[in-house]
């Protein structure tokens, strides 16, 4: 298919920049499955598959350098973003993909089955009702409207020495004001996306 050839070329170009060439085929399979399901179940507002490459896949992979530990949770994962691309890139890490939407979890279970991704565990539950036996090394989300809300709703999930990783667009000046924990902000560029992108890394320790 010509369309798929173009998408594969876009994907390969970006993955070369990330030095992740080896995972191209699996990411393409995920993208095609997402595009197929999205036509029926409205899993993401982005309809154009070329835009999905940059705004979904590359934006997810861009935060790889800041993931901490082996036990990761993606809260409000939706159709597995950023969790699925991260899990494909890091098969040695374990990812819990949390969402309350049944259609999205059904999609993730199908992704797990068809693509044979063994290091993900999709779970359908509201975040406040999820109480795992151990805390997570990194709690990731791009679903919360504010950093304060993210910490409020997920503080029971982060390990004692764990990390919150919030994906943002513009530098979140006002959102940082009420944060009592130590944090830093890392700006990053995404192939195919113009404008600011940053992630906020918040340690599970209070400021001194």
Swiss-Prot record:
Assigned keywords, A-Z: Cytoplasm, Methyltransferase, rRNA processing, S-adenosyl-L-methionine, Transferase
Any single GO CC term annotated in Swiss-Prot or TrEMBL for this entry: cytosol
InterPro entries the record matches: rRNA_ssu_MeTfrase_G (IPR003682), SAM-dependent_MTases_sf (IPR029063)
Location(s) in or outside the cell: Cytoplasm
UniProt keyword Repeat, yes or no: no
Principal EC category: transferase
GO MF annotation list: rRNA (guanine-N7-)-methyltransferase activity
EC number(s) given by UniProt: 2.1.1.170
Catalytic activity: guanosine(527) in 16S rRNA + S-adenosyl-L-methionine = N(7)-methylguanosine(527) in 16S rRNA + S-adenosyl-L-homocysteine
UniProt-listed Pfam families: GidB
Binding locations of S-adenosyl-L-methionine: 76, 81, 127-128, 142
Family: Belongs to the methyltransferase superfamily. RNA methyltransferase RsmG family.
Protein role: Specifically methylates the N7 position of guanine in position 527 of 16S rRNA.
Protein name: Ribosomal RNA small subunit methyltransferase G
Upper classification of the organism: Bacteria, Pseudomonadati, Pseudomonadota, Gammaproteobacteria, Legionellales
Gene: rsmG
């Amino acid at each position: 298919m010509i369309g798929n050839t173009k998408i594969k070329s876009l994907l390969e170009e970006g993955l070369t920049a990330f030095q992740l060439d080896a995972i191209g085929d699996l990411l393409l399979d995920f993208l095609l499955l997402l595009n197929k399901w999205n036509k029926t179940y409205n899993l993401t507002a982005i309809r154009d598959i070329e835009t999905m490459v940059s705004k979904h896949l590359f934006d997810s992979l861009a935060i790889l350098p800041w993931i901490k530990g082996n036990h990761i949770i993606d809260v409000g994962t939706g159709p597995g973003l950023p969790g699925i691309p991260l899990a494909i890139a890091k098969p040695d890490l374990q990812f819990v993909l949390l969402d309350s939407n049944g259609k999205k979890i059904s999609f993730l279970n199908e992704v797990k089955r068809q693509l044979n991704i063994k290091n993900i565990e999709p779970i359908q539950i509201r975040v406040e009702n999820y109480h795992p036996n151990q805390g997570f090394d990194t709690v990731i989300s791009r679903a919360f409207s504010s950093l304060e809300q993210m910490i409020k709703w997920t503080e029971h999930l982060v390990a004692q020495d764990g990390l919150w990783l919030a994906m943002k667009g513009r530098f979140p000046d006002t959102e940082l004001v009420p944060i009592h924990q130590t944090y830093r902000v890392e700006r990053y560029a995404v192939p195919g996306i113009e404008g600011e992108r940053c992630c906020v890394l918040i340690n599970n320790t209070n400021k001194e």
